[in-house]
Amino acid sequence: MVLKVISANQAVAEAAKLAKPKVIPVYPITPQTSISEYLAKYVADGELDAEYIRVESEHSAMSACVGASGAGVRVFTATSSQGLALMHEIVYAAAGLRNPIVMANANRALSAPLSIWNDQQDSIAERDSGWMQIYAESGQEALDSVLLSYRVSEDRDVLLPSMVCLDGFILTHTVEPVDIPSQDEVDTFLPEFQPQAVLDPDEPMSLGTFTDPNYYMEARYEVERAMERSRKVIAKACQEFSEMFRREYGFVEDYRCEDAEIILVAMGSVCSTLREVIDDMRDEGKPVGLLKVRIHRPFPAEEIKKAVSNAHKIAVLDKNITFSVGGALHTELKALLPDKEVYGFIVGLGGRDITPEHIMEIVRKTENPERTVSWIGLKEESQ
């Protein structure tokens, strides 16, 4: 391994290079752009043997990914916000066609109003598309998640695309030390892609043909079954990754939850801030813990239940809004934990800072609740 001080975007690009994709269709968009720039440089400099396609839009990027994956090669792309929204039509097609594409998404708010700053609305809008979703907390986790995603997506029992999500600017442009595995290590962990069905003119077949009501429902059921099968594949891949690279990952990560009366639940980079504040609260005698949801799809229901089993109250921080019912993760936990008091907090939309004071406010509101869903960090005149 080599330790480099790099941004999370460069970490993602390094991971993609190590995975040796053969086709990389990308359209640049802030704050993802430097991922595509690094990959273009790797290809131009001869460090990566791949076809780098400069497409005219994100819709075309995902379309090219689907075509290349259908032709039997490993594929990578990256996008953000409006770019992911433009891909929406083909995002669903990729899952239905069982293309094991890996895509990095630099989480950014959706327009309108136009914003280039972070929240997680873009990827949450695709949570039901059939893609697996991982939310990274650090540059190291972003790099590792790309490698793990290929390992899981390409498994014959899964064959579903993966989206590695990293918070725009907060993570994408933050520079920190990242351990980069050697090519030999990655080649051992991630063997060459062995496609199951390939578009080959010498052996013609059809993929994604018109389907009438006699077959469509079964096709969607197969995606659901693959998503369920991915749980065991993910667990095995994480175990083997830990043995090889000495970094442990799972569906969730709990911190000081054993005796916690209140557990804060979140995804992404905010978890680093939450740990610091929780330590301060513990020093003051407040029994608070953190549950980081790392893998959002497949949804880690049993892991969440186990982690929060001893807590009385759950506070869910969502960087998204599902209008009229709160945030997406909050609605899922509220349905999952009917015997718990589950409160939702909308935070950080459009890049609004989530400060230690905001986190302490969330704990206070959970201790003495006035409503099920609260917005944190709003300007006073808006409240």
Curated annotation (Swiss-Prot):
GO BP terms: response to oxidative stress
InterPro entries, per the entry: PFOR_II (IPR033412), Pyruvate:ferred/Flavod_OxRd (IPR050722), Pyruvate_synthase_PorA (IPR053390), Pyrv_Fd/Flavodoxin_OxRdtase_N (IPR002880), THDP-binding (IPR029061), Transketo_C/PFOR_II (IPR009014)
Pfam families associated with the record: PFOR_II, POR_N
Reactions the enzyme catalyzes: 2 oxidized [2Fe-2S]-[ferredoxin] + pyruvate + CoA = 2 reduced [2Fe-2S]-[ferredoxin] + acetyl-CoA + CO2 + H(+)
Organism: Methanothermobacter marburgensis (strain ATCC BAA-927 / DSM 2133 / JCM 14651 / NBRC 100331 / OCM 82 / Marburg)
One GO molecular-function entry: pyruvate synthase activity
Enzyme class per UniProt: oxidoreductase
Gene: porA
pH-activity relationship: Optimum pH is 10.0.
Record lineage: Archaea, Methanobacteriati, Methanobacteriota, Methanomada group, Methanobacteria
Gene3D superfamilies noted in UniProt: 3.40.50.920, 3.40.50.970
Subunit details: Heterotetramer of one alpha, one beta, one delta and one gamma chain.
Keyword Lyase included in the entry's annotation: no
Protein name: Pyruvate synthase subunit PorA
EC number: 1.2.7.1
